[in-house]
């Protein structure tokens, strides 16, 4: 079975809210909410991939020193196994915007469970609830 490494981030604002992104139509899991991030390319470090993805998807600049690993998801889908480290980031430059057609929403931790999410994302919520 194919293994896929995807990095994700919980961007946390000064009010303790987490930024969530809604997958746009035409993509796998369209309409579901997820933590921003993306695939790690061959030979790429996870932190570098996350910095690249945040610039491409949200138009924000993040430095590696602002990324703190929190937990990870390990989930088997029908055709691949996903490994997804989740980082926390509380400092970035710029205002997050959905540059790839995705809707964005700031959510307090206790409301995360109300959002429909891909199965791999759901277990990560408990770690954020504990943190926040």
Placement of each model-derived feature along the sequence:
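Conserved Nudix-box catalytic region and its N-terminal flanking loop in Nudix hydrolases
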Residues: 17-56
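Generic C-terminal helix-cap and adjacent flexible tail
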Residues: 1, 129-132
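NUDIX/MutT-family hydrolases
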Residues: 86-90, 96-128
